[in-house]
């Protein structure tokens, strides 16, 4: 199989040599020869292989290899007694041309087997070649990833180790395909990771990408998109730039980027020449982007020359390196007369100084007289040459321990063993490194260098000049100093935005379509919801409310009326005044307990009635107090009881009057159960009915407190008694019955003469009470959603009910007692009853305990008896 591959390669070689024109080759004699592959020329157009001379990536890198070889050959400690030679070719920045050139590296191997043995012809003789070159021990190069991939596929067939100084495609880490390839630079996925971290650092989540055709751009942008997706960064549009695109085609790429106005950041994974053309097209179209560019752009002045305005604000990445001052001195000392070994140097000299050797006007120029910019990967070229030299040095020590020259074990060098045992295991301090730099050259198990990057921004300096400014680095993590970035400084205002959708507010969540992570609609959470995550609102639950940051919930404080609230001040003031007034009336009645007015009023029922009124006022304090089990029990017990005390006394009083006047139709016989003791007993019996109802209510629905939240006002948690408002109605139903009966009796006695005013006052009291209750009950149930209004309504209504009784029944009596004492005497009118002597007898009987006597009068068209205190 290997002989067949060698034969096919030989045919390809002979065909290329026979048909191709003479080519330039840099050859240095040596005991061991290292191949070199550099983009001395830029890629040409459709009609030519090669373009103009590439000063930085071509000439400088090539001279860096020669510089390193000179130093190694003069080093007595590195390969002593062994001289390294070189066989350097021009790739013209094209993979196809590089593959043709690389056939030179394998020509010497075509006459030997993979293990170094010579091929035997069918007739038994050894194969010979008239111009067979010295065998290449290893190759330094190439620059571009697609070039290295093509060359690596060829070199692996002949087990020739290859160390690249600039190829960063992640494909080259695949040791199953590129098992003789190593590099002093890291693969692109480290760079892609650094670029993705930069985007996430500035919160750029929606970007466009541009990649150069070929392995460098395509695999690089694939690695970037993978890292971007892991960080929820989306790509709005992806564009490619080709090798032979026109200016109009580059402008078309810029217009395609402009079609995504939300993606203000464009990520470039392009070659330097493609980046240069893209910037020029951007400037021609007067467009503007924030560029994040790979090391293809790096910190090269040639990329931004003439397009400074379009490049301003760009963030670029470059492999971490340092300039080699010795190389700068070496390169600036070169001229066409002392550097004749480089066959391309005269061509470079002519283009650099715009002179011609034919006209003999090039001698006056010097590289020392012009600005010098050391290409960023010079360090990696030198490290690659030194890595190969150290590997050969270690191999020589292992295989040729007793000689400083090459022994038979290294004639020829076994490429497989050189790569597997020595190149991959090499480790040494980087040559020419600054004293304060800790830089070690070594390879990982994939043959890759260690990933370290410098990060630059391109900014306008003083006097309108532009320059690159280092703003950070990446070494397994991002470190940025934004103070050097003009648009990222605090005084520059908000950062440039590059996102599909604006960030949602604190109380909003994202609503995205399946598969989308960067474009969304913002949906507000309900006031009672918190943000479970950026996509979900979650209900806090009744009694809880989201915190200020909407990251969780807290338990709402329990609301209840406090003594200092405005809702409490009014009812409490009314209740205090009413209670004082009640106590005042009670005191007056006790003081004048034996007077006719007090006696005629029915002293016992009056005191019971005053007790009920006082309870009504006291209920305000019970309802304003903080709900507790004891308070809730008092509310149930006290409200209905206070009313029942009042209305039981009034019902007993009106019933007595009605029975007294109703009995006149059958004679002046004294009605039953109208004595004070009977009246008190009847009143207490009526009150006990209410107490039984309340007791049953307390048993069926045990008192306690509970938290209540209205659906329309979930932010308010009310501490309330646990009874239902409907059950309150059942408790008050009994009092409604008492009021109805009182009102009925008051209505029946409405036509009693003016000299019997007690019935009229009771009637007026009951009519007013009915109005209050008719207004109170609807208001109480309608305002159930607002505990403050409901409680205040309850307190005021109860106090009004007591005030009506106090004002309508006791105020007239109080007026006579205090201001008209002359009327507070017994009247001695003569009886005029048609019942004759019966009246005095009845009067005597009815007057017991009340000091009154019956006198005939007319009520509802009938003759009835009247109290002696008729003026009440």
From Swiss-Prot:
UniProt note on tissues of expression: Is widely distributed in the CNS and prominent expression is seen in Golgi cells of the cerebellum and some particular neuronal cells in other brain regions.
Gene responsible for this protein: Grm2
Any one GO molecular-function label of the UniProt entry: group II metabotropic glutamate receptor activity
Cysteines paired by S-S bonds: 50-92, 234-518, 355-362, 400-407, 500-519, 504-522, 525-537, 540-553, 632-721
Cellular component aspect of the GO annotation: astrocyte projection; axon; dendrite; glutamatergic synapse; neuron projection; plasma membrane; postsynaptic membrane; presynaptic membrane
Compartment list: Cell membrane; Synapse; Cell projection, Dendrite
Subunit and interaction comment: Forms heterodimers with GRM3 or GRM4. Interacts with GNAI1. Interacts with TAMALIN. Interacts with HTR2A.
Keywords on record: Cell membrane, Cell projection, Disulfide bond, G-protein coupled receptor, Glycoprotein, Membrane, Receptor, Signal, Synapse, Transducer, Transmembrane, Transmembrane helix
Cytoplasmic side: 591-604, 656-679, 748-760, 820-872
Gene Ontology terms: biological process: behavioral response to nicotine; cellular response to stress; G protein-coupled glutamate receptor signaling pathway; gene expression; glutamate receptor signaling pathway; glutamate secretion; intracellular glutamate homeostasis; long-term synaptic depression
Sequence similarity: Belongs to the G-protein coupled receptor 3 family.
InterPro entries: ANF_lig-bd_rcpt, GPCR_3, GPCR_3_9-Cys_dom, GPCR_3_9-Cys_sf, GPCR_3_C, GPCR_3_CS, GPCR_3_mGluR2, GPCR_3_mtglu_rcpt
A Pfam family the protein falls into: NCD3G
Glycan-carrying positions: 203, 286, 338, 402, 547
Main location: membrane
Residues that hold L-glutamate according to the record: 57, 61, 145, 166, 168, 295, 377
Known role: Dimeric G protein-coupled receptor which is activated by the excitatory neurotransmitter L-glutamate. Plays critical roles in modulating synaptic transmission and neuronal excitability. Upon activation by glutamate, inhibits presynaptic calcium channels, reducing further glutamate release and dampening excitatory signaling. Mechanistically, ligand binding causes a conformation change that triggers signaling via guanine nucleotide-binding proteins (G proteins) and modulates the activity of down-stream effectors, such as adenylate cyclase.
Signal peptide positions (record): 1-18
Stretches the record annotates as Important for interaction with HTR2A: 677-685
Name listed for the protein in its UniProt record: Metabotropic glutamate receptor 2
Membrane-crossing segments per the record: 568-590, 605-625, 637-655, 680-700, 726-747, 761-783, 794-819
CDD domains hit by this protein: 7tmC_mGluR2 (cd15447), PBP1_mGluR_groupII (cd06375)
UniProt topological domain (Extracellular) ranges: 19-567, 626-636, 701-725, 784-793
């Amino acid at each position: 199989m290997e002989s067949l591959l060698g034969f096919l390669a030989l045919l390809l070689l002979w065909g290329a040599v026979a048909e191709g024109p003479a080519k330039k080759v840099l050859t240095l004699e040596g005991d061991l020869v290292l191949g070199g592959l550099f983009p001395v020329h830029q890629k040409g157009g459709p009609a030519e292989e090669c373009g103009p001379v590439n000063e930085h990536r071509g000439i400088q890198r090539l001279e860096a290899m020669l510089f390193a070889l000179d130093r190694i050959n003069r080093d007595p400690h590195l390969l002593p007694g062994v001289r390294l030679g070189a066989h350097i070719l021009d790739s013209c920045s094209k993979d196809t041309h590089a593959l043709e050139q690389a056939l030179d590296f394998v020509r010497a191997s075509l006459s030997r087997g993979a293990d170094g043995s010579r091929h035997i012809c069918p007739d038994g003789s050894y194969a010979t070649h008239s111009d067979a070159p010295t065998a290449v021990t290893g190759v330094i190069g190439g620059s571009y990833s697609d070039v290295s991939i093509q060359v690596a596929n060829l070199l692996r067939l002949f087990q020739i180790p290859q160390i690249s100084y600039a190829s960063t495609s992640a494909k080259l880490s695949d040791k199953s395909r590129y098992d003789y390839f190593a590099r002093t630079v890291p693969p692109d996925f480290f760079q892609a990771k650094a670029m993705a971290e930069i985007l996430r650092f500035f919160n750029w989540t929606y970007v466009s990408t541009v990649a150069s055709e070929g392995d460098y751009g395509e695999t690089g942008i694939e690695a970037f998109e993978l890292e971007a997706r892991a960080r929820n960064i989306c790509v709005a549009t992806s564009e490619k730039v080709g090798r032979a695109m026109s200016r109009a085609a580059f402008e078309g790429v810029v217009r395609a980027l402009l079609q995504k106005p939300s993606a203000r950041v464009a990520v470039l994974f392009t070659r330097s020449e493609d980046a240069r053309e893209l910037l020029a097209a951007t400037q021609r179209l007067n467009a503007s982007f924030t560029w994040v560019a790979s090391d293809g752009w790096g910190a090269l002045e040639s990329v931004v020359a003439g397009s400074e305005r379009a490049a301003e604000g760009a963030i670029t990445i470059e492999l971490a390196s340092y300039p080699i001052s010795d190389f700068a001195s070496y390169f600036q000392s070169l001229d066409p007369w002392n550097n004749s070994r480089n066959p391309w140097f005269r061509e470079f000299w002519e283009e650099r100084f715009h002179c011609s050797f034919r006209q003999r006007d090039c001698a006056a120029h010097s590289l020392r007289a012009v600005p010098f910019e050391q290409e960023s990967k010079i360090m990696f070229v030198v490290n690659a040459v030194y890595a190969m030299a150290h590997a050969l040095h270690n191999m020589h020590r292992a295989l040729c321990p007793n000689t400083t020259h090459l022994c038979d074990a290294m004639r020829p060098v076994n490429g497989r063993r050189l790569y597997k045992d020595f190149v991959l295991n090499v480790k040494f301090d980087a040559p020419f490194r600054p004293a304060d730099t800790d830089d070690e050259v070594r390879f990982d198990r994939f043959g890759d260098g260690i990933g370290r990057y410098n990060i630059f921004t391109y900014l306008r300096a003083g006097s309108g000049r532009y320059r690159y400014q280092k703003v950070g680095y990446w070494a397994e993590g991002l470190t940025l100093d934004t103070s050097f970035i003009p648009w990222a400084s605090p005084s520059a205002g908000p950062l440039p935005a590059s996102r599909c959708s604006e960030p949602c507010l604190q109380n909003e969540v994202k609503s995205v379509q399946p598969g989308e992570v960067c474009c969304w609609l913002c949906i507000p959470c309900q006031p009672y919801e918190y943000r479970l995550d950026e996509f979900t609102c979650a209900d806090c639950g009744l009694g809880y409310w989201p915190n200020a940051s909407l990251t969780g919930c807290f338990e709402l404080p329990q609301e209840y009326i406090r003594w200092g609230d405005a809702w409490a001040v009014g009812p409490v003031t009314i209740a205090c005044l009413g209670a004082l007034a009640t106590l005042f009336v009670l005191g007056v009645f006790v003081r004048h307990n034996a007077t006719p007015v007090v006696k005629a009023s029915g002293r016992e029922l009056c005191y019971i009635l005053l007790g009920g009124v006082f309870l009504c006022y006291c209920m305000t304090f019970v309802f304003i107090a903080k709900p507790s089990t004891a308070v809730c029990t008092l509310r149930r017990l006290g409200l209905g009881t206070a009313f029942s005390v009042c209305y039981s006394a009034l019902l007993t009083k009106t019933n007595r009057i009605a029975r007294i006047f109703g009995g006149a139709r059958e004679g002046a016989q004294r009605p039953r159960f109208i004595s004070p003791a009977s009246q008190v007993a009847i009143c207490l019996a009526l009150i006990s009915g209410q107490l039984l109802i309340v007791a049953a209510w307390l048993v069926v629905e045990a008192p306690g407190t509970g938290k209540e939240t209205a659906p329309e006002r979930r932010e308010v948690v009310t501490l309330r008694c646990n009874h239902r408002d409907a059950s309150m109605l059942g408790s008050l139903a009994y009092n409604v019955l008492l009021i109805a009966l009182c009102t009925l009796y008051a209505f029946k006695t409405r036509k009693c003469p003016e000299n019997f005013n007690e019935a009229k006052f009771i009637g007026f009291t009951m009519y007013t009470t009915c109005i209050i209750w008719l207004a109170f009950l609807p208001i109480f149930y309608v305002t159930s959603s607002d505990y403050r209004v409901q409680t205040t309504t309850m307190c005021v209504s109860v106090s009004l009910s007591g005030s009506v009784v106090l004002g309508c029944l006791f105020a007239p009596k109080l007026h006579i007692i205090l201001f008209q004492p002359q009327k507070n005497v017994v009247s001695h009118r003569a009886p005029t009853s048609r019942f004759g002597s019966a009246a005095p007898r009845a009067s005597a009987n009815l007057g017991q305990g009340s000091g009154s006597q019956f006198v005939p009068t007319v009520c509802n068209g009938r003759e009835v008896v009247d109290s002696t205190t008729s003026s009440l």
